């Protein structure tokens, strides 16, 4: 006979119910605490984000209002150098010539089947972010093309091509007697440098235009505290030049340095008694027959000093006229604009300094680079701005662009000049 066990009744039913209630309350409390923690964390995070936004907005607002007086503000707003920096800076107008030079235009088939890397010339220039390309033969325009929404009247930036204009002004100032010679110490014109360091007395003007001054210069355009950024973006470039530091003996080695042209600019304005822009206009830009107004960037409205290393702007055809002048021994027609002796001094490799850069054997002389392999010389600026002079075939090539377009233009311009020479002799 089957039997069943009697199930023992819960002797403490109230205790079980209490435990369940306590567990539920604990779970609810835990959930409530977690929600509070999440809510507090989210509020704190949002407050921090809002604070950072307000700080950034405040810093940006301060920088925007301080753009004419603060290097740090320019670093925040502008960042590094750009090919169209001329749009950011105040400038002085460099007026066009009263007697502009217009080159004769020759209709030629030289460029009809001219190709580079299998592409037609125009296609290649467009693809490499070129904005202007000019070929002069003697006094005749063989090729003039504009690309990527540029035009004949468009403003092109010199960038460091400006240095070649600056050295030319030094040659003219020596010829006019404003400067005695390149062997004068820079302290003859800027004596306050001696208060900074007595060794400045050993630095000559020649050292400054040969890039052998021995001054410190660190290249890092993205760093607003680097020498590179200071010399191109300072709102007081005279003071920046006076803060330059000697790190090695002058005359011993080439070291590309943008403090050098700043000091040259101070020498020019003190020696001539006028702004460097006015000296450019009256002694070079106008006399060489510039067709359009140019300009020279200023460090700031308050300081009013030219950006000596980079800041000349104008039409591509007028930049070509500097190369044309040098091709003709410093003459614009019958007028001797640049002393012939200066042109010879600049373009002879005998006294040049080896730079140790580039695929060609490049030498530096008075802010020009000598392409020894092709017996040519050129002015070069950042983002591949070029005035390339090839005397053997009486050629001047000018290239402007927003960047290099992945091309080694020094070598390519030499190759183009050689190919044009070959085609002209057919």
Question: Model-predicted segments: where are they?
Answer:
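N-terminal leader/targeting segments and the immediately adjacent pre-domain N-terminus
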Residues: 2-7, 12-150, 178-179, 419-426
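Short, small/polar residue-rich loop motifs at catalytic or cofactor-binding pockets
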Residues: 127-130, 154, 382-383
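Active-site SXXK
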Residues: 139, 157-182, 208, 264-268, ...
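Short, charged, amphipathic alpha-helices and their helix-cap/turn boundaries
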Residues: 140-145, 187-188, 222-250, 274-293
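A short acidic/small-residue loop/turn micro-motif
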Residues: 147-151, 155, 403-405
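Active-site helix/loop module of the DD-peptidase/beta-lactamase fold
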Residues: 176-215, 243, 270-309, 314
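Active-site-proximal alpha-helical segments within enzyme catalytic domains
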Residues: 260-267, 308-331, 385-401
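Active-site Gly/Thr loop motif
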Residues: 291-297, 343-396
